[in-house]
Amino acid sequence: MTHPSDTGPAPVLALEDISKSFGAVRALRDVSLELFPGEVHALAGENGAGKSTLIKTLAGVHRPDAGQVLLDGRPTVFHGPADARDAGIAVIYQEPTLFPDLSIAENIYMGRRPRRSFGRIDHKATRAATAALMRRLGVELDPERPARGLSIADQQIVEIAKALSFDARVLIMDEPTAALTGSEVARLFGVVRTLREQGAAVLFISHRLEEIFQICQRVTTLRDGALISSEPLDGMTEDDLVRRMVGRDLDELYPKQEVRAGEVAMSVRRLTREGVFTDVSFDVRRGEIVGLAGLVGAGRTEVARAVFGIDRWDAGEVEVEGRRLTNGAPSTAMAAGLALVPEDRRAQGLVMNMSIERNIGLTGLRTTVRAGLVDRGAERSRSLDWAAKLQVKYARIADAVSTLSGGNQQKVVLAKWLATGPRVLIVDEPTRGIDVGTKAEVHRLLSALAADGVAVLMISSDLPEILGMADRVLVMHEGRVTAEIPRSEATEESVMAAATGRAAA
C-alpha cells in the first residue's frame, strides 16, 4: 500500500496483514490499512464486514492474532485502550459518554485538572485550556456550561476536544453523524476539516455514502473481513463504492413498484397534543407509501406514537379500516391491524438480551400461548419462518438479538411486526444506521408490502429515501403539516421549503 503522492508523508498509523478470529468466526483476514497525517480516510463496508473489529484493533481493545500495528513506521503492541490513547489514538463514537452534571471543562480534564499549591484544582487554568481547545477547533462553547442539555453534535465536539487534550494525532470517528441534523453535520465537518488542516489523521466511518464523498480523500473497503480495496475517492462514483462493498451491482436502491392506491386504510383527523403537534390530518390508502418528512423536532415521531396509542392526544381522532382507535391504547391499535416499527430499534423495538426467536414471537403471544404457557415449538416455527422471509443473518435462532448487526436487528423488528399481518405499517427511520445492501432490501420489502395492499407511513430524515420511495410526501414543521406533495412534484427543494416553514399546506 502506498500513499497517492510518492513524496507525501509516511503513515502515522498502519495495520499490516492483520487477522483476528473469535472462535470459528474470522472477523479480519490479512487486512492492511494506512492512515496519513492531514487526510480523512473512509472505512466502508456492510454490517459484519469487519469495521468494528478493525476499529477496536486500532484502539487497543483487541489484539490481532496475526499481523502487526505500526506507529510512525515502527511495530507496536497495544495491551489495552490506555496504550492506544497514550500513543495518540482516540475514538469518537456516535453516542458520546459525557458526565451530564459536570461542565465541559471538567469532562475534558476529568482526573487531569491543573493543580495549584497544596494540591488545589486550578479552575482558571482548566477553563483557559478548554477555551484554547475550542478556539483550535473553531467553535464557541462555554467551558463552564454543563454537559447536560448539549446537543449530540456539541457533545461530539467536546469528545474531540478531549481527544486533542491527550495530544491525539489519529481520530477514529464511528458513525458520528447518525443522530445529527443537516446543519449539525455541516458544523461537525467544519471541525473535521480544521483537524485535517492541522495535520491530524482521521478515520471516518459512515453508512451515508454522500458524506464519505463530501469529507474524505481516500477509502478502504472491507467485505466479509477481507480487504477489497484502498484507493483515492477522486474519480470514483457511489455506484463504484457500492459494488466494492457488496460484491455485486445493487438492483435499484429505491425499487418502488407503481401501485394504484386503494381505499383509505388509516385516517387521522385534527390530531392535537398540546405543545407537541397541532391539527394534524392525513389519510394513508391501501397500497400506498406515504412519506412523512421534516426536520428534527418537527413532531413526526410524536404523531406516530400518538396514532399507535403509546402517547395520549388531547384532541382529534384516528381510524383504521373504519374502526376508531381508543386514545392511548396500543392494544386497540394492534387489534385494528396497525403496526409500528419505532425509531430507536435497540431501546424501543427489541429486548436486547432476549433471543432472536423470542423477539420475533413477542407480538404473537396470543396465538402461541396454550393454557397459560408459551408453545415454544409454535414460536420457533413462526420465528424461523419470518427470519427466513426477511433473510436475517444469524448463527442460531436462539442467540441473543444483541449479537446481530444493526441491519439484521432492524429485520428482526420488521419480522416481529409483519408477523401480525398488519393492514397499516408505520416505519420510523427504517434504514437509519444500516448498510447500503440491507437498506435496499428494506426498500424492496416496503415496496412489496405496498404492492400487497398494505398501507405504509414512512417517517424518514433521509430525503433521497423519501423522494425515492413515497407516493405522496407529507411535510411537518413545528408540529403542523405544512405541505402535501405528490410524487411527481416532490423535490429536495420543495420538501425543504415546507420543512423550514417557507411553504404553506
Curated annotation (Swiss-Prot):
Membrane topology type: Peripheral membrane protein
Main location: membrane
Coiled-coil segments on the chain, per record: none
Location of the ABC transporter domain: 13-249, 259-503
GO MF: ABC-type D-ribose transporter activity; ATP binding; ATP hydrolysis activity
Domain of life: Bacteria
Catalytic activity: D-ribose(out) + ATP + H2O = D-ribose(in) + ADP + phosphate + H(+)
Binding site for ATP: 45-52
EC number assigned by the record: 7.5.2.7
The keyword Cell membrane appears for this protein: yes
Oligomeric form and interacting partners: The complex is composed of an ATP-binding protein (RbsA), two transmembrane proteins (RbsC) and a solute-binding protein (RbsB).
Family statement: Belongs to the ABC transporter superfamily. Ribose importer (TC 3.A.1.2.1) family.
Name of the protein in its database record: Ribose import ATP-binding protein RbsA 2
Organism: Streptomyces avermitilis (strain ATCC 31267 / DSM 46492 / JCM 5070 / NBRC 14893 / NCIMB 12804 / NRRL 8165 / MA-4680)
Gene that this sequence comes from: rbsA2
